């Protein structure tokens, strides 16, 4: 998720 949410995805 770009804006975040579950599991810390690469928010780049």
UniProtKB/Swiss-Prot annotation:
Belongs to the periviscerokinin family. GO terms for biological process: neuropeptide signaling pathway. GO terms for cellular component: extracellular region. It is found in: Secreted. It comes from the Eukaryota. Mediates visceral muscle contractile activity (myotropic activity). Keywords: Amidation, Neuropeptide, Secreted. Transmembrane segments: none annotated. It comes from Panchlora viridis. InterPro entries: Periviscerokinin. The modification Valine amide is found at residue 12. This is Periviscerokinin-3b.
């Amino acid at each position: 998720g770009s804006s975040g949410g579950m599991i810390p995805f690469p928010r780049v």
